[in-house]
Amino acid sequence: MQEGSFEWYQSVFKSILDGQMDLYENQNDTYQLLLNMKQELTFNNKEVMDYAIKISKYAHEMAAYMAATTGMAEYDDLYWKFLLLEGQHYQVDSGLLYLEKNRVPSERFYEPRRSVFMQHGIIQSLQDLMDDKLDIFALSVPPGCGKSTLEDFFLSLVGGWFPNCFNLSSAHSSILTRSLYDGVLEIINDPVEYTWHEIFPNVQMQGTNAKETTVNLERNGRFK
């Protein structure tokens, strides 16, 4: 087995995961190994990325558990590092959580509503859109359930993941469309409340048009 191959990484991960994953050293080794695998194999390979995300999600759950039971900041830091890695690679739930990492917990939008969104399959459906398992996702819920704000958050992530692609959003009134535009801009432009630029450090705002409610990321132009 060649060192640095996918099979080699799988073997090393298995060895770590078969040990005590409640130990900080093993969790940190897992994180560092994921970073190395990303650099050596790249996550453009779907099999590699799917495997890495599976490992990362298990590790971040263990880090969250240990942070809650021990109160140790080291576990909490690792938890967020795993989420950042996942959020940078098209994971909706992780990206939504990480966007509000720096917000006061009582002021967060997503985390307090997360279990309800999960229970009704909303986040999984958004993930299925990202994974190309769904072409259309239709959601009908009563007013005040947070669907418009969730759309703001989701679209800000989609814009970061695909900055040179066209993403169209509209509503039944110009007021709601403008609200969506303002919401996405706030998430992108407010580094105190949101961590959008930590997730997408290489994506820059190139221009906005308030009249047409358009946002250009990465590069301008009609033909991106």
Outline where the language-model segments fall:
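Phosphate/NTP-binding elements of NTP-utilizing enzymes
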Residues: 2-224
